[in-house]
Amino acid sequence: MSELQQVRNAKGDRIAIVMGLRTPFAKQATAFHGVSALDMGKMVVNELLSRSELDPKEIEQLVYGQVVQMPAAPNIAREIVLGTGMNVSTDAYSVTRACATSFQSTVNVAESIMTGNIEIGIAGGADSSSVLPIGVSKKLAHALVDLNKARSFGQKWAIIRRLGLKDLLPVPPAVAEYSTGLSMGQTAEQMAKTYNISRADQDALAHRSHTLATETWDSGHLRDEVMVAHVPPYKSFIDRDNNIRENSSLDSYAKLRPAFDRKHGSVTAANSTPLTDGASAVLLMSESRAKALGYEPIGYIKSYAFSAIDVWQDMLMGPSYATPLALKRAGMELEDLTLIEMHEAFAAQTLANMQMFASKKFAKEKLGRDRAIGEIDMTKFNVLGGSLAYGHPFAATGTRLITQVCRELKRRGGGTGLATACAAGGLGAAMIVEVE
């Protein structure tokens, strides 16, 4: 029995990535301050439909994701359908897989096309770190429920007297893993120590990322995949990612103090991704439908895989587990790839995964493989810069990676590319695309 993944529908059509688009990515509380993930999602989907010149009513399914949930609009996908002119009957649902969320939404739409349920769909994700669901303490939440049930003034006063001043303080969304209490930064620090990754190497990777991203923007390569976003009340706009250090100097990175282990650490704000706002989306179709409508797809999905490992130690190793699965399902080896796009959540996490790609010991002990995944050729790796420079709106990063690798392959004349990411919860995602 063949181990190759058949990413096709019953007619033999491949799954076409017709077009991809994103907003510029903005640091927390800057250009998108006050703009919700839902509003950014509607913004990018509207623009995607406009650029594709596709009637919104042709969309049969929309799967969209968000990591930092909005209690007021928990099904972001449905709200996007209602706010972008699609049929009210359009199938829409929301997903979340931490930083791999829009990998998941893309796969869900692709699988709907593979089964023949639909021929046209949109996938993507959005997150805002500027519009946050600020909560209340557990004690206050408990008291508010009790107050709702209380009838007399005496009952209500007794409930109020249970509360102290600290119980009234707002509670921001958790930045730590629910099961371990560890933040992503603490995990990156773990990985730096486990794999002996130096501060100098982390800073060098961050400097490379910012330098390449600056060159990419200056060359104009991103203009067709990043929209101009006009921000309510429409007196300003953003047309470029604002986290990129356009005059990055390697010497300047050494000036920052460690952020998560003040005494012995090496992970800093400069070699980590910042909290970021943004949205992205891709338009997917069956190959025959795309060609019948006159589109030239930017790529096709060849294979995909997800992985999960333990969360207590070095949990951001997802690319090292998901990538070999995707390669096997595509019938490929790492050296067969034309380009590699790996999410750079932290320089330490990225370098740890790169190190384990080349490790025979890791391959044998963790993956059950006879050979290493392969040593990464840096001339193929994150050639336009990565998340350290562009930023990381959690749910939007997956479709940013997929679009970026497809468009760069197209610009170079075609080939195959890998997009891969780690994610909270010990999760990983990988997708191989082919471009003609």
From Swiss-Prot:
EC number: 2.3.1.16
InterPro entries in the cross-refs: Ac-CoA_C-AcTrfase_FadI (IPR012806), Thiolase (IPR002155), Thiolase-like (IPR016039), Thiolase_AS (IPR020610), Thiolase_C (IPR020617), Thiolase_CS (IPR020613), Thiolase_N (IPR020616)
One CC-aspect GO term: cytosol
Signal peptide feature range: none
Gene Ontology biological process: fatty acid beta-oxidation
Pathway membership: Lipid metabolism; fatty acid beta-oxidation
Subcellular localization(s) per the UniProt record: Cytoplasm
Listed GO MF terms: acetyl-CoA C-acyltransferase activity
Keywords, in A-Z order: Acyltransferase, Cytoplasm, Fatty acid metabolism, Lipid degradation, Lipid metabolism, Transferase
Keyword Phosphoprotein assigned: no
Catalytic activity: an acyl-CoA + acetyl-CoA = a 3-oxoacyl-CoA + CoA
Functional note: Catalyzes the final step of fatty acid oxidation in which acetyl-CoA is released and the CoA ester of a fatty acid two carbons shorter is formed.
Family membership noted in the UniProt record: Belongs to the thiolase-like superfamily. Thiolase family.
Stored HAMAP family: FadI
Subunit structure: Heterotetramer of two alpha chains (FadJ) and two beta chains (FadI).
PANTHER family the record matches: ACETYL-COA ACETYLTRANSFERASE, CYTOSOLIC, ACETYL-COA C-ACYLTRANSFERASE
Protein name, per record: 3-ketoacyl-CoA thiolase
Gene expressing this chain: fadI
